[in-house]
């Protein structure tokens, strides 16, 4: 995963700036409630900010640190070198998006929708993504480490080279013809055997 391209000295902002191109700012404890469809955000850091009723279209080199998102949409969004760290992202819409070199770390994201998205060189690290949907997604060089993936849906998504061995995957829903190449631990393998309709007797 490529490193963020953020200046070491960012201009401090105490409120949102209404510009079409927002670059090289750090926002702290700011509440943002507006449509950001026509705004390109580049090289910024958001710390302990709240986003409500927002939608994004293009994000590059951004850190969201301890932020809360309510009714926020990243549908059909391009995210490049974006880090979500210790954020509350439950219910967020990421469908039909392109994510490159993007990090989700220590986030709570129940029932997120990633359907139809493409992930390239992304990292999911110690997140709770219970009930989220990864339907018809495309993964390239993407990792999941110590994530809670219980009751997630992966229909029509190739799981080749995805490593779930350190994750919780209880009640995961997948397409049986897309399992080739997935990496799981021995106990998880039994769950996948059940998904295939195979009965195991001791």
Role assignments for model-derived ranges:
Residues 2-202:
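Tandem repeat scaffolds
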